[in-house]
Amino acid sequence: MSHGPRQPGAATAPAGGKTPGQHGAFVVAVKQERSEGSRAGEKGPQEEEPVKKRGWPKGKKRKKILPNGPKAPVTGYVRFLNERREQIRTRHPDLPFPEITKMLGAEWSKLQPAEKQRYLDEAEKEKQQYLKELWAYQQSEAYKVCTEKIQENKIKKEDSSSGLMNTLLNGHKGVDCDGFSTFDVPIFTEEFLDQNKAREAELRRLRKMNVAFEEQNAVLQRHTQSMSSARERLEQELALEERRTLALQQQLQAVRQALTASFASLPVPGTGETPTLGTLDFYMARLHGAIERDPAQHERLIARVKEILARVASEHL
């Protein structure tokens, strides 16, 4: 242990009997030696290598202030990252995590204000809900128990620090303190790694499912496009047939009108009946029956009918 400057009381105290001043000076000397030793140990590496800014240690969770309290909300930017990260990872599975974050940061900066405001509004809504739940939790019995437990742990730590100082003054190693300083670290690390592995496995499984669903979706989209094309083709054919039907109906109406007008001067023999648009079919049947009964007698009528039919056919067919 390196020795720094001691207090005058500690340097000039007699070595014989124990006096109150001697005990206090010894405590101060021990504290200074510990403080200066730690400073000397910290100073050396800093002179050799500049201190780098480091984030929260990897694999170590931040301590939750309220273990049973409501989950803290995330910002609008974090909501955007959580929503888009898996989509980018699916499209670019080989892209490292920092590159994905960098890509999403650039995408966020170029995002339209209206779209960006949507995430900010959702984050603000979640924040207000969190404040309500936090206030309700602070009024609950669980919060009181939690704060009491935190206070008890704080007192235990202070007692442990006092016990460490007493042990040093008595010349013993701080076995209990060393055991407390490494408390639960291996267990925590193993549990964290197991949880992280399980989470990564679940993410891989979900990504595979997502890829399978996207492939099925692509197949269904192709079928849908094919069905849509077939439906459009059938609709076009139906429209064409409807136009043809309408044209034929108009042509038929024109032929019936021409026949009615042409046969108006040609009554049925024996009855004197002439056709109208409503009775044209009945008239033609009666005329055909009269001619078949005695063709020789109605030769002039037959010639007249042929002449009318030829003229109507040339004009309307």
Swiss-Prot record:
UniProt biased composition (Basic residues): 53-65
Look up the DNA-binding region in the UniProt entry and give its residue ranges.
70-138
Supply the name of the protein: SWI/SNF-related matrix-associated actin-dependent regulator of chromatin subfamily E member 1-related
PROSITE patterns tied to this protein: HMG_BOX_2
State the organism of origin. Answer: Mus musculus (Mouse)
Q: Summarize the subunit comment.
A: Component of a BHC histone deacetylase complex that contains HDAC1, HDAC2, HMG20B/BRAF35, KDM1A, RCOR1/CoREST and PHF21A/BHC80. The BHC complex may also contain ZMYM2, ZNF217, ZMYM3, GSE1 and GTF2I. Interacts with the BRCA2 tumor suppressor protein. Interacts with DTNB.
Q: Which gene holds the coding sequence for this protein?
A: Hmg20b
Residue ranges for the region (Disordered) are: 1-71
Q: Does the keyword Phosphoprotein apply?
A: yes
SUPFAM superfamilies xrefs? HMG-box
GO molecular function terms here? DNA binding; four-way junction DNA binding
Can you tell me where the transmembrane regions are?
none
